[in-house]
Structure formats: C-alpha cells, structure tokens
Curated annotation (Swiss-Prot):
Protein family membership: Belongs to the PC-esterase family. TBL subfamily.
Entry GO CC: Golgi apparatus; Golgi membrane
Keyword Transmembrane: yes
Keyword RNA-binding among UniProt keywords: no
Protein's UniProt name: Protein trichome birefringence-like 34
Motif (GDS motif): 133-135
Domain of life according to the entry: Eukaryota
Organism for this UniProt entry: Arabidopsis thaliana (Mouse-ear cress)
Main location: Golgi
C-alpha cells in the first residue's frame, strides 16, 4: 500500500513538473513572438512620420522633391538677421529674383519636422554646439544662427564674438546656449588653417595631426563636421614633420586616399575623446557646385549665373560632387559605428544638386576690385559654390534639427 502511494505521488509530481515546463515554454514562445512582431528599428533609417498609411514602411528624409512654398518660407528675413554674412546676402547685393527663398524640401513618404527655434534652444540649454569645417559649414552656421535668433525678441539676450581666430561664437544668454563655428577646412592640420590667409598653390596637410584643432571641440555636446571642396585636386602633399621646422618629409598622395586618411585621423581622435552618451556627432555630406551649365542642358562654358529655376530631373548628379569621396565617408562612418561610436551623416548632396539657382552668383560683397572682363562677362565672377541665405542651408539645418531632437524615428 505504501509503495503504491509513493508511486502515485511520483506520477503526480512528474506530471506537475512536465506541466510547469510546458507552461513556461508557452509563455516564452508568446513573449518571443510578440517581441518579433514589433517593427524593428533600422539604425540606418531616416524615417519620420509615414504619410503612406503603411506604418511598417521606412521613410528616407533625404529622398524627395522641392515644393514652392511662399507661405511658410523663408524661416527668417535676410534683413532682420544681424548676423548675416555679406558673402551670402544675395538680396542685399542686388538679386531681384527672390524665388530661391521659398522652396521647402518634401520627402517622398513623410514630412520633415517644422523647425522650431525655441525647442532647439531648449535642447541646447547649458550646452554647446559647434560646426567644424570650411566656408560651406560656416554658411550653414550663419543659417542656424539666423534661424534661432529669429525667436529671441530681446537683442541684448544674444551676441556674437569673433576676434579673428578660427573660432566664432554665438551665445543665447537666456538659455546659456552656445553655437560655435570653427574653421578647419581639411579637419586635420594644414597650410590652409588661417581663417583669412589660406589660399596657396600647393595644399599641404599633416595627415596625422588634429589636436591643434580638436582641442577647441572637446566637451562639446553636438559637433557638426564637413570637409569636401578643399580636397578637390588630383594630389595633395602630406607632411610628416611640422610646418615650423624645415626637416619635414613631404609626399604627394592621391586625393581620395589622403582624404580617407584624414577621416581616419578624425575617427581615432573621436574614439578617444568623445563620450557617446554625452556628445552627438554629425557629418554633412558634400555640397555640390554648379559650375558647368552644359551638365543640366544649359549653354556651354556657362555656370549658375542667371539661373532662376531648379533642375527637375530626379536623381540628377553633376560633376560638382564626387561619388568616390562619398563612398569613403560612408565606409569610415560605418567602421566608426562598428567600433561603438555613431556619427550620423546628413545627406544633403542629392537635394542640393537640384538647386542650381540657389548660389550667390555675382550677388555678394566683392572683396577686391572687379576686373573689366568680370564686368563684361559676369559669369566669370559668379560664385556657384556657396548658397544664398535664406535658402538651401536652412533646409540642411532642418534635417539636422530632426536628428538633434530625435524626430527622425519611424
């Protein structure tokens, strides 16, 4: 009898154990399936609000079209921004066709978040944001300063400091928010580092030296890099040594290779000095030029001078951008991410390709005496590199704003 009771007890115990295991398995399976039924976040996604009705569909902020919008644009008035650069103030210097101010970027399947200067300043409260790079990045910095200063009603609550060095500072006092620009056109140390005296026939870089510049970015909360146009020559001299001493070793290196080396030097510095939990990193892709009108069906040997319309061919690419350099940048950023540090590329290249009419052309301050041939042939003096403000760089900053405020996730 006792043996039979023990046997029955063992059977019941085994049954309960098996049942418990089965229940646990069912619970685990249900949780696993429910987790995997959720939409997965793609780290490369550029999505915001999907307008297509399919919530699982990703949106790329950088694929879209320009829409004329003279109701909500421009985001500020050229004459109202006391920080405007004369190099970019096209209306002030005589441009009559002002339609370049009224174009809004519309992604194909979503909406770009509307820029809100107050929200950005709140996000930047007690923080520092710095743009690092060449004059294109300086133009984007001017754009951002104009965009945020337009919501500050007290002119005494903001100021700009420029003592002629590489660093220019904008401060919004009420928020203790700093938005800086730092001149470093090749990112690493070079013979073009002087903010005013930087044009030489030979471009020379110290490819492994970046600390001279980088110490000015340390402890920033947001860093926005760019570097493109200053590399555009077949070969660049690389210096092993210092500019002060005469015993340095110079070697001409193919441009794409030395560009990659500079980006790797930047990456190595960031890995050592940047806390990814504190600092957000961005890299603006290349800003295209429009110096050959024949590329978009215009007159041979002409450029952006006199252009008043956009390029309407979707996917248009001219020779003012370099796919090889773009691939190098993407590969370096991918490698950096694989090592645990994310630097988001803001891909402004394709959307800017369409805007051949957005450059200053001849409508800017002339820093020297205008030559006779430039008067008779204005296109020879046209700036088809930089951008009028308000204009294209405002959209670059709207894209940047979406990432800073994390309004880019699906």
């Amino acid at each position: 009898m006792a043996k039979r009771q023990l046997l029955m007890l063992g059977i019941r115990t085994s049954f309960h154990t098996i049942a418990a295991v089965l229940v646990a398995g069912l619970i685990f399976t249900a949780v696993f399936l429910s987790r995997n039924s959720l939409p997965k976040e793609n780290p490369q996604s550029h999505g915001v609000t999907d307008r297509g009705g399919d919530s699982g569909r990703e949106c790329n902020l950088f694929e879209g079209k320009w829409v004329f919008d003279n109701v909500s644009y421009p985001l500020y008035k050229e004459e109202d921004c006391k920080f405007m650069s004369d190099q970019l103030a096209c209306e002030k210097f005589g441009r009559k066709d002002l339609s370049y101010k009224f174009w809004r970027w519309q992604p194909h399947t979503c909406d770009l978040p509307r820029f809100n200067g107050t929200k950005l300043l709140e996000r930047l409260r007690n923080k520092r944001m710095v743009y690092v790079g060449d004059s294109l990045n300086r133009g984007q910095w001017v754009s951002m300063v104009c965009m945020v200063s337009s919501v500050i009603t007290n002119p005494k609550a903001m100021y700009m400091h420029n003592n002629g060095s590489n660093l220019i500072t904008f401060k919004a006092l009420e928020y203790n928010a700093t938005i800086d620009y730092y001149w470093a056109p090749l990112l690493v140390e070079s013979n073009s580092d002087d903010p005013t005296n930087h044009r030489f026939p030979d471009r020379i870089v110290r490819i492994q030296s970046i600390e001279k510049h980088a110490r000015h970015w340390t402890n920033s909360d947001i860093i926005v890099f760019n570097s493109y146009l200053w590399w555009r020559m077949p070969h660049i001299k690389s210096l092993w040594g210092s500019f002060e001493k005469l015993d340095g070793i110079y070697k001409e290196v193919e441009m794409v290779r030395v560009y990659e080396m500079a980006l790797q030097t930047l990456s190595q510095w960031l890995e050592v000095h940047v806390n990814p939990n504190i600092t957000k990193l961005f890299f603006m892709s290349m800003s295209p030029t429009h110096e050959r009108a024949e590329e978009w069906g215009g007159i041979l040997n002409q450029n952006c001078y006199g252009e008043a319309s956009l390029i309407d061919k979707e996917g248009y690419t001219g020779r003012g951008s370099d796919p090889k350099m773009m691939r190098v940048l993407e590969n370096v950023l991918d490698g950096l991410k694989n090592r645990g540090l994310n630097m988001q590329m803001i891909n402004i290249t394709q959307l800017s390709e369409y805007r051949k009419e957005g450059h200053p052309s001849i409508y800017r301050k002339q820093w020297g005496t205008v030559k006779e041939n430039e008067i008779s042939n204005p296109s020879s003096n046209a700036d088809c590199i930089h951008w009028c403000l308000p204009g294209v760089p405002d959209v670059w900053n709207e894209l940047l704003y979406a990432y800073i405020l994390d309004h880019h996730s699906s």
